[in-house]
Amino acid sequence: MDKVKPKSLISWLLFDLANTVYAFVIPGLYFSVWLVSEKGWTDQQLGFATSSAMIIVAILGPWVGRKSDGSEGKKRLLLLMTIMCIASTFLLGTFNVQISVILFVISLIGFNLGSVVYDALLISVSNEENRGKISGMGVAFGYMGSLIGFGVATVLQSLGYSYVEIFRSVAILFLIFSLPAFLFVEEKFVSAEKVKISILSSLNIVIKSWKHSRQYKGLTRFLVGRFFYADAINTLISGLLAVYLVEEAGLTPADSQNILALAIVISIIGGYIFGKAADKYGPRRLILISIFCWIISLSLAIVATEFNQMWLIYVTGVLGGFNTVSYTHLRAHETMEY
């Protein structure tokens, strides 16, 4: 059994805390509300900006993944993506709204590509016996980051600070909490080979891998199924949920923040539970349970708004918090199983 230094593990966990501060405050809540409620953009325009970022991530993701595989270069790639995200987040709202949206797209690209590399570093801080548990701890740390980001943003807002100043505070928090990962995480040696590959070549590898996947029972179904449910969940938690609560459900920004805070608390508890359960039962069973619970949650949200049963929104918040943590935790673990 490979032994991991506590300093390396804690530093890896702190990065999860750092990037979840960003994920919750910027795309998850404040930027989307600022763009739609303050600047008059529509949720469709927000969705288009988010989709544009995701298309670029889909193109560059295989290249980033290939570059980080088979060599000790993950931390360098993670540093590049993190700087991209932090710098563009710090500048949000500094210029006009159009440039701010472009910066938002850049920050999303940096965040998501960084997550690809960060997930790959899981093998450097865990072994086969405790990988699910460590991943679950990472998610729990991540949602602690959401609470920190939520707390700082709420205090700043109550003191009269602007959205722009909240954006900058998030960038600073991301920087502070991510630094230990670059200083203390020790990468496991895989290969001294330096991978040189173009973006086009990486896409060709993806196409060939897709064709090759048909030789493995269940893998094609897994990839197709994951695409559909992951796309739906990413769309929901990357800003449209906060806009829905304010614009469609008619809640105040304060009420929507309370619901999301409730979901975070549930997520922290669920992170450890799902980590232990994944080690015992495997990610496949838990993913099926999670998808079923997502269907129930979204159905309750529709009923709540159609029949003006706002108490159901809070029930949805509880289920959504548990579902979100299951999805986030199993994202890395399930991929390794296949």
Regions found by a protein language model. Name each.
Residues 3-54, 221-225, 231-248:
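Helix-loop boundary and gating motifs at the non-cytosolic
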Residues 70-82, 280-291:
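Cytoplasmic membrane-interface "Motif A"-like loop-to-helix N-cap segments
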Residues 135-151:
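Glycine-rich segments within core transmembrane alpha-helices of 12-TM secondary carriers
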Residues 328-337:
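Conserved small/polar residues in nucleotide/adenosyl-binding loops
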Residues 2-6, 189-223:
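Juxtamembrane intracellular "pre-TM" segments in multi-pass secondary transporters
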Residues 83-96, 293-306:
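C-terminal ends and interior cores of transmembrane alpha-helices
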Residues 99-113, 312-325:
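Hydrophobic core of transmembrane alpha-helices in multi-pass small-molecule transporters
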Residues 61-72, 271-282:
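Helix-to-loop junctions at the C-terminal end of transmembrane segments
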